[in-house]
Each structure stands twice: as structure tokens, then as C-alpha cells.
């Protein structure tokens, strides 16, 4: 199914979550650009290329939401302790997992898939002996704010980030979720 196709059917009971396969990374990169690009998200081509090189090398990991064999959601996260220095002032313990991307197909938005992906990472983190998860978003991105709130993330703070944010307040909000 083409990535850009609008999906109007309700989520089926066949929805499942699985690790990304190396042989689908090219497709998932296109999916991320096509479904994740909007005024709030920072998706520089060179940064995403580097992100997918890390995925191919097994440095980072990705989880895919699949409906009837079609990827409809994606979350990318790093290894414990691998947190961008930009966020270090907001965390006390570096034994955390940084979630770099969460994207849901536009035809599936508002159905809880992003929250479900985050909850799956929270479940995995509990088995990895980490203290928390860290994620960021544009301060004014209400859809991301709600998704993260539903998954139990709380804001640690916001900072002016004109290098990555070109609209609205130009602030990034850093959030965390303690691992149970």
C-alpha cells in the first residue's frame, strides 16, 4: 500500500506491534518523512539519515505498529544512557532511554497508536533496568502533548530552541516517564 494513501477504516483487531526489520528501514524512513513532517517536528534530512544508519547498525531500535501487514506507526529509541547532550540539564540520572521519534500514519491519527507505541517502550524499559524514559516535543504541539500525557509523561521544562524550532514559541519541551 502506498504510504500516502488515506486509510479510513477503523483499526482492526489485527493491529500488532513488532520490532522494525532491517530490510524495511528504507520504507520506514520514507514513512517518517511523509507522515512525520509538519510545522512542529524537526526532521532534518541529515539527522534522519544518521538516525537510520544507527538503526541499521543496531545502535538504536525501532518498534512498528502494523495493521494488516501495513506499518501505521513508528517509534525510534536509543540505548540506555545514550541521551543527546541537549537534554542533559533536564535529567538527574543518565540511565534513561531517549525516544527520538514517534510517528503515526495520518489516516490512523487520534486512535491511540502513538500512546500504545510509547506504552510498549515503557514495558520494554522495565525489563532493561533503566530509571526513566526521556522524550521531547515542540512546546505548542498539542497532539504530541496529549499522546505523551496519556502515556504518563510529565514535563521537566522547556527551552528556547531556534535551531530546531522555527514556528510558534520556538521552544522544546523535555518530558520524562519514570519506569515502574
Please place each PLM-identified region on the residue numbering.
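A short, internal acetyl-CoA/4′-phosphopantetheine-binding micro-motif in the GNAT/acyltransferase core
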Residues: 93-94, 100-109, 137-138
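Conserved catalytic-core motifs of GNAT/GCN5-like acyltransferases
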Residues: 136, 149-169
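Conserved acetyl-CoA-binding loop-helix of GNAT-fold acetyltransferases
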Residues: 104, 110-123, 146-150
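A short beta-loop-alpha structural element at the N-terminal edge
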Residues: 12-30
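Conserved GNAT acetyl-CoA-binding A-motif
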Residues: 125-137
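Conserved beta-strand-loop-alpha-helix junction that forms the acyl-donor binding cleft
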Residues: 135-145
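Conserved acyl-donor/pantetheine-binding loop and adjacent beta-alpha core of acyl/acetyltransferases
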Residues: 74-101, 162-166
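Active-site rim helix/loop that mediates acceptor-substrate recognition in acyltransferases
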Residues: 40-67, 76
Amino acid at each position: 500500500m502506498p504510504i500516502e494513501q488515506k486509510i479510513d477504516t477503523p483499526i482492526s483487531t489485527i493491529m500488532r506491534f513488532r520490532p522494525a526489520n532491517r530490510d524495511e528501514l528504507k520504507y520506514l524512513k520514507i514513512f517518517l518523512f511523509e507522515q512525520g513532517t509538519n510545522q512542529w517536528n524537526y526532521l532534518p534530512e541529515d539527522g534522519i539519515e544518521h538516525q537510520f544508519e544507527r538503526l541499521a547498525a543496531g545502535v538504536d531500535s525501532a518498534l512498528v505498529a502494523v495493521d494488516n501487514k501495513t506499518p501505521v506507526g513508528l517509534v525510534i529509541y536509543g540505548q540506555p544512557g545514550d541521551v543527546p547532550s541537549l537534554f542533559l540539564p533536564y535529567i538527574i540520572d543518565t540511565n534513561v532511554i531517549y525516544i527520538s521519534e514517534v510517528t503515526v500514519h495520518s489516516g490512523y491519527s487520534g486512535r491511540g497508536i502513538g500512546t500504545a507505541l510509547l506504552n510498549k517502550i515503557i514495558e520494554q524499559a522495565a525489563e532493561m533496568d533503566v530509571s526513566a524514559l526521556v522524550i521531547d516535543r515542540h512546546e505548542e504541539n498539542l497532539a504530541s502533548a496529549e499522546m505523551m500525557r496519556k502515556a504518563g509523561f510529565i514535563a521537566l521544562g522547556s527551552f528556547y530552541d531556534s535551531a530546531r524550532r522555527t514556528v510558534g514559541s520556538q521552544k522544546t519541551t523535555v518530558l520524562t516517564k519514570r519506569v515502574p
